[in-house]
Amino acid sequence: MKRRNFIKRASLTGLGLAVVPTIISCETEDKKDKKAIATATPVLPIVVATWRFHNATKAAWEVLEKGGESIDAIEAGCRIEEADLKNTTVGNGATPDRDGNVTLDASIMSKEGDYGAVVCMENIVHPISVARKVMEETPHVLLAGKGAEQFAVSQGFKRKNLLTKERKKAWEEWKVKSEYKPIINIENHDTIGMLAIDKNGDISGGVTTSGLAYKMAGRVGDSAIIGSGLFIDNTVGGATATGMGEEVLKTVGSFLIVELMRQGSTPQEACEEAVKRIVTSNPNYKNFQVGYVALNKQGEYGSYCIHSGFGISKYQEGKQTYVESGSYVES
């Protein structure tokens, strides 16, 4: 679609802000999903996140409804999951790597296009906050391993052993039967990726994760890599990913989605195309999961995944909802 047509459509959308939500069918080139996703009625602010992270989106919404900026909402929301011991894929109490160490990745991106990230960081509960400090307090974009941990401590963060007794026991059991192979399946992906637009219409995003369960030491997925796990362009919108990070990295998925939206695709269409890029290039796509979420400047959202079971949490107009994503492979 030509840019002038995209602008025209965006203008028409703006004229009907409070009328009806836009309905977008989940459709691929060769088949149509029976589900349909209703994009958000373009009323701001709005926050969306991967999976059923309702507590996280609620915390983010509480910032937004008070007139707070989207970047603050993102940090507040992600911190909720990082501190939750019941969430074994993020922050404190997360599943360790194959050597028994909990290593965390996180990234955050602001309306200005500034970016901060940490990878392979240990002993710090809130990597999303450290990532923001990297963005705001250093000339760098990404810090890794011990360097990231040392920087966090210099910024006032306290060290803490993140490996719980429960996760240590599970790791020890895994070692006996696994032959040191990481668990790779369509369920082993609970990264939280979050996108928010504040009342000023400015968008920010963040991602936080412990990565693939029992991964090789030093493994870095897509979550902290700009353009893969997260990308924001305040003139267009944003996108985030969850799932098999290696596949997202190879297709630079979040950047692809934002660029497709820039060219006129809806968030839903862009997410579907990003998934299609993966399944057409990897014949083993039935053995792993990838899911995308996108949000444009008009407040319209979309999501799509390879396998059913993925969805997004949305908070808007004081209401929390869960929207099941369409999928390439029908259950």
Where are the regions a protein language model picked out?
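Twin-arginine (Tat) signal peptide motif
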Residues: 1-7, 30-31
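A generic alpha-helix preference that emphasizes hydrophobic side chains
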Residues: 3-4, 23, 128, 254
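N-terminal export signals
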Residues: 5-26
